[in-house]
């Protein structure tokens, strides 16, 4: 008999939506393009780009996601474009306007999405005492593409400061998002500092950082600095699609067919799902909103994609929308799990425990199964396969459950 932790919880391929560049009310990209044009001499279109993304739009987006089961990650940039800290108040808006947005985010966005900072400003590197740009000016996404590895404490404190601002407004982050190229040339070091930076604020044993994209081939979720004794690790989240919802400019390409075609067979997502690879969509908030409140080009494209994916798997037998932290926590649990088979008994040592832990068992026919003395219910269809059940398909049996203890025993009857 062979036993392994299944690659995906409930053996359903995860789908997740990454939203980058979002924050409290302001469109930070207006200021990024304005300021970056001065720095590099390029002529990005910026003057007619909206300065504000209304709370009403964000609320409508969140309600749609909750209604249709969409899950993922939503950035809240802590000090957007160095305009001010959101825990101290942005000078552009009243305290009441900002508190209203934050309350909406805590009630609606958090229900469907992880919250992460996208480092502190997504533009200038700031001094941690003043939160003003350092001189000479450095850019988070350009000058810190290679993080200053010789200043480990500074980088750790910088990431921790981003997390602390969010925690101060009741939005404890599950991990961090990289602004542009941030950390891309020093990924191992980046992973090293993310762990203590996030844990020092939230206590999360398995935070993640979003860095990188898989254009083709396998979609990995690397696990860094795993410590089985402490039950800690850092996961690296990677996207697996391009951004065809308006992109980072807010006026880029919009094409739902590039995700999934109307006949449900073409596009990037079906290719991923059919190969058992996570479909992790990367989009930008300014693209969802577009150029004005009646535009919503990216949001309209998302609605089409969500509808087509539901048509493709109407009973949710093969796929499941997930928060990014659900994907990364499961990857940590799977990577660190120890599985020992002794006859009809499976001994599990689980430094990281996650909901819906799923085992794949081959080489024997299972009549009954129990976890910690509690029987699992036998089901005969994928639609009914859930935590607390087991399902036999062909030569394999899947068993899913909620492990209550690090050392868990699964008893089988053949």
Name the predicted role of every residue range.
Residues 1-9, 16, 22, 28, ...:
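Active-site-adjacent pocket scaffolds in enzyme catalytic domains
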Residues 1-14, 352, 405, 413-414:
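Mature N-terminal, pre-catalytic/accessory segment of carbohydrate-active enzymes
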Residues 14-16, 26-27, 34-142, 174-177, ...:
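Short, well-structured secondary-structure segments
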Residues 21-24, 77-83, 120-124, 180-185, ...:
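Short, solvent-exposed loop/turn segments at secondary-structure junctions
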Residues 44-61, 91-103, 152-161, 188-196, ...:
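Well-ordered, non-membrane alpha-helical segments in soluble/globular domains
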Residues 44-49, 88, 145-151, 248-257, ...:
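Surface-exposed cleft-lining segments at the edges of enzyme active sites
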Residues 272, 283-287, 292-336:
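Catalytic cores of secreted or luminal carbohydrate-active enzymes
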Residues 324, 334-414:
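C-terminal beta-sandwich/jelly-roll accessory domains of carbohydrate-active enzymes
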């Amino acid at each position: 008999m062979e036993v392994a932790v299944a690659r995906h919880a409930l053996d359903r391929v995860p789908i997740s939506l990454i939203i980058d560049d979002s924050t409290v009310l302001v469109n930070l990209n207006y200021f990024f393009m304005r300021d970056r044009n001065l720095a590099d001499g390029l002529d990005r279109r910026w003057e007619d780009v909206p300065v504000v993304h209304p709370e009403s739009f964000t609320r409508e987006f969140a309600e749609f996601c909750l209604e249709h089961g969409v899950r993922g990650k939503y950035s809240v940039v802590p000090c957007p474009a160095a305009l001010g800290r959101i825990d101290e108040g942005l000078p552009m808006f009243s305290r009441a306007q900002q508190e209203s947005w934050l309350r909406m985010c805590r009630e609606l966005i958090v229900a469907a999405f992880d919250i992460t900072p996208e480092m502190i400003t997504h533009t200038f590197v700031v001094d941690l005492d003043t939160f003003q740009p350092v001189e000479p000016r450095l850019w988070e996404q350009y000058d810190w593409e290679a993080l200053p590895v010789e200043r480990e404490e500074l980088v750790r404190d910088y990431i921790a400061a981003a997390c602390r601002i969010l925690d101060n407004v009741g939005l404890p982050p599950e991990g961090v998002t990289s602004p542009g190229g941030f950390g891309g040339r020093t990924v191992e070091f980046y992973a090293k500092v993310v762990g203590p930076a996030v844990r020092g604020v939230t206590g999360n044993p398995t935070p993640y950082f979003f860095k990188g994209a898989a254009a083709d081939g396998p979609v990995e979720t690397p696990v860094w600095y795993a410590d089985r004794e402490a039950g800690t690790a850092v996961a690296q989240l990677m996207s697996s699609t391009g951004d065809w919802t308006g992109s980072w400019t807010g006026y880029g390409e919009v094409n739902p067919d590039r995700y999934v075609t109307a006949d449900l067979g073409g596009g990037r997502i079906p290719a991923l799902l059919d190969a058992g690879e996570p479909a992790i969509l990367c989009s930008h908030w300014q693209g969802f909103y577009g150029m004005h409140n009646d535009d919503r080009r990216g949001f309209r494209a998302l609605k089409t994609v969500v509808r087509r994916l539901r048509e493709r798997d109407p009973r949710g037998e093969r796929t499941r929308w997930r928060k990014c932290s659900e994907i990364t926590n499961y990857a940590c649990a799977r990577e660190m799990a120890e599985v020992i088979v002794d006859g009809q008994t499976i001994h599990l040592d689980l430094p990281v425990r996650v909901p819906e832990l799923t085992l794949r068992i081959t080489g024997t026919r299972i009549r009954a199964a129990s976890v910690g003395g509690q029987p699992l219910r036998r089901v005969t269809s994928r639609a009914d396969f859930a935590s607390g059940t087991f399902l036999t398909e062909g030569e394999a049996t899947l068993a899913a459950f909620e492990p209550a203890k690090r050392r868990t025993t699964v008893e089988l009857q053949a």
